[in-house]
Amino acid sequence: MSNIHDMEFLQKKVQELKEQGLYKELVTLEGPSDAECVINGKKVINLSSNNYLGFANHPRLKKAAIEAIEKYGAGAGAVRPIIGNMKIHDDLEKLLAEFKREEAVLAFQSGFNCNAGVIQALTDKGDLIISDQLNHASIIDGTRLSKADKAVFQHSDMADLERVLKEKRNNYNNVLIITDGVFSMDGDIAKLPEIVALAEKYNCLTYVDDAHSSGVLGESGRGTVDHFKLHGRVDVAMGTLSKAIGVVGGYVAGKKVTIDWLKNRGRPFLFSTGLPPAAVGAAIEAVKMLMESTEYTDKLWANAKHFKEGLGKLGYNIGHSETPITPIIIGDEAKTLEFSKKLFENGLFSGPIVFPTVPKGTGRVRCMVTAGHTTEQLDRAVKICEKVGKEMGII
């Protein structure tokens, strides 16, 4: 009889992943996340981070983080509802509310925590959550935690969304329609104006996850709501401090009454220690930089256009991305892993995305262009993609 502490059941599952070509090893950065970085001792062009604006290693953010530590210490010391709420937290939320053009904001420890806590706090038994088929895992898990009933509509299919509304709306108290602003695997933008129109037609609430559009879409990166000029018509806008902002954390923006409720019933907010001062100080500086100039967002979009054009000329399948997210769709899982491995060997890191993150048969390397990349680096990346693609018979 085997020893239960040997975790034999997990050993079998890990072995199955390896046999299926789905097992992934963690790579280790030996320095900051930047346009070029050192991974496992090798210097490579980094096309895998969510550091859209190049802020993660920006001198202004590092200086602000150090100053915040010197003033407030290394940690908050408690959950914010007890004695972990520092003035720097309030300053961040006030600035974010101004930036997002919303009444109020509440910051969470991560974007995942934000969705997991907010969705369940806003819905209850007798309510219905309607979610896009390709919404992020944090939305799926937040929905599971809710007592509300759930329904899913086909990805960005407004006819299917209206079908669900016609069938179900009258059976529930409140209905919450949730969508990603930008879908992280394909880079397409939600049809937010159409979603809002249907929500208003059927008297529903709307919730947009702006994780991949904060700092990317809208004026100076204000997000999807600003991109479509839907201020006052989207009830909840979630954002992250971990991607374009370059630090860590998440936040939700909306009406003051919504934020007041979440301060009392948002479980991750209630039961997790507040964000550390260094992260908050750096995030404040990043938002200030966005409010000062469009320099970084302009560079991001120019770089994305340049890189997409280069891949397009090679004949790669880059899907229907409308944002800097640029998938190179390979298909077969094992071939995707091999493609990513060969890119790395040639000086380019773009991590493989395979099942269960994306459906089987749609494996891809997801290239994340940033404002921090130079034209020379992007041209070099395209040449590496050309070399590997031809060697493997992909192009």
Curated annotation (Swiss-Prot):
The molecule here is called 8-amino-7-oxononanoate synthase
The UniProt catalytic activity note for this protein reads: 6-carboxyhexanoyl-[ACP] + L-alanine + H(+) = (8S)-8-amino-7-oxononanoate + holo-[ACP] + CO2
| NCBIfam families named in the record | bioF, gly_Cac_T_rel, PRK06939.1
Highest taxon of source? Bacteria
Organism of origin: Treponema denticola (strain ATCC 35405 / DSM 14222 / CIP 103919 / JCM 8153 / KCTC 15104)
The enzyme class is: transferase
The record lists substrate as bound by 24, 136, 357
Q: In which pathway does it act?
A: Cofactor biosynthesis; biotin biosynthesis
EC numbers for this chain: 2.3.1.47
Q: What does this protein do?
A: Catalyzes the decarboxylative condensation of pimeloyl-[acyl-carrier protein] and L-alanine to produce 8-amino-7-oxononanoate (AON), [acyl-carrier protein], and carbon dioxide.
InterPro entries xrefs: Aminotrans_II_pyridoxalP_BS, Aminotransferase_I/II_large, AON_synthase_class-II, AONS_Archaea/Firmicutes, AONS_Archaea/Proteobacteria, PyrdxlP-dep_Trfase, PyrdxlP-dep_Trfase_major, PyrdxlP-dep_Trfase_small
Residues bearing N6-(pyridoxal phosphate)lysine are 243
Q: Signal among the record's keywords?
A: no
Which CDD domains does the record cross-reference, listed alphabetically? Answer: KBL_like
All disulfide bonds of the chain are none
Its required cofactor(s), as named, are:
pyridoxal 5'-phosphate
Q: Which UniProt keywords apply?
A: Acyltransferase, Biotin biosynthesis, Pyridoxal phosphate, Transferase
The record's section on PROSITE patterns has: AA_TRANSFER_CLASS_2 (PS00599)
Q: Which family does it belong to?
A: Belongs to the class-II pyridoxal-phosphate-dependent aminotransferase family. BioF subfamily.
What's a Gene Ontology MF term here? 8-amino-7-oxononanoate synthase activity
Its quaternary organisation is: Homodimer.
Q: Which GO terms describe its biological process?
A: biotin biosynthetic process
- Residues annotated for pyridoxal 5'-phosphate binding in this entry: 111-112, 184, 209-212, 240-243
Q: Which PANTHER family match?
A: CLASS II AMINOTRANSFERASE/8-AMINO-7-OXONONANOATE SYNTHASE (PTHR13693), LD36009P (PTHR13693:SF3)
Among Gene3D superfamilies, the record links this protein to: Aspartate Aminotransferase, domain 1 (3.90.1150.10), Type I PLP-dependent aspartate aminotransferase-like (Major domain) (3.40.640.10)
